[in-house]
């Protein structure tokens, strides 16, 4: 694809938007089970699952039609630091169509439709929807669950995303969505080693799919910045660019001018991780 992606520690793509306005976002889900007994299908590493979607599809429906064939299996061994790479994927396109993809007991579960506007972490999506239905009956103006648990954050996000102004004006829509994301973020410094799905929020991103602008906010820096895809040269001769976010780098506003030449990242591979596990 020609587009943008958040590359976590040079190990894989966790979030991004391609030039067609398709957005893919990967989040932790402890209930994920990718393996099937005796599965002999070709293997795709979980670290490139998001990038595969961004590289190959322009719309959610295109992606769903191909992915539901389950022509490959996802390999998701433990990371070098010992944490499980149990994840689920949300994709959305510029029409507003969305799909949430989860591997449960080795089988791909897909929820597709414009009504699916929120994804957090645990529990699995069908259970999460049932919890949210209960809170809809309670009514968000009366009471909302307020803990850092992902199921509570889902309920709050689901209520507030419908309460904010529904407008095509990006100057209102982007900060409105960010206000919801900040409300459901886990404060920095909170750690629960045995429950990574309720650990601190490290960043927030908003994708303006109609105007092709990708907004990013790190909890370690004071400013919101963005990249306008319309201003970036995506021709092969332009090569790969990156925006370094480590070592105290701070950006504000349009950061296209700050892009640097880069090599392609090396995704975490099955063999690389197995080598770590046997040390």
Stretch-by-stretch model annotation:
Residues 2-11, 271-278:
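Conserved small/polar residues in nucleotide/adenosyl-binding loops
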Residues 5-41, 74, 252-253, 258:
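A contiguous strand-loop segment
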Residues 20, 55-61, 170, 210:
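A short, structured loop/turn motif at beta-sheet edges
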Residues 30-32, 106-108, 220-224:
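Short, surface-exposed beta-strand-loop junctions and turns on beta-sheet-rich folds
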Residues 37-72:
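Compact, glycine/acidic-enriched structural inserts
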Residues 69-108:
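Catalytic cofactor-binding cores of redox enzymes
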Residues 75-77, 84-85, 94, 117-274:
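C-terminus-biased signal that marks the final domain/tail of proteins
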Residues 97-101, 105-127:
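Aromatic-residue-lined binding/catalytic grooves and analogous aromatic/hydrophobic interfacial grooves
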